[in-house]
Amino acid sequence: MKYLWFILLICSPLSFAASFDCAKAKTPDEKVICSNLKLNDLDVEMSVKYHFLRGLFAMGVSGEMYDSQTAWLKQRQKCKGDTTCLLQSYRARINQLDKLYNLIEKPI
């Protein structure tokens, strides 16, 4: 599984910048993500995994994933500019997405 995620990150055009336009960053969390390489990398990793997984599921589950992502983004905003809080938030979300991926039945 790690290899699949790695390939997705390498091949993704998002792998060089945050998943949003840093020139338009307004909230404290967005500004810190854009200025911190580790947070920027985690943002890209989370975004790639989220969009990959969302594309695998039918509308019902895809809608639930969208709702879950929206709720997570609201929670992330509560971190404001706290780097430690943002790191924990991203790691927790990536862990959730990894667990969801592991639930998918895969061919050999």
Q: Where are these predicted regions, by residue range?
A:
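Sec/Tat signal peptide C-region and signal peptidase I cleavage site
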Residues: 5-8, 13-17
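N-terminal alpha-helical modules
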Residues: 16-108
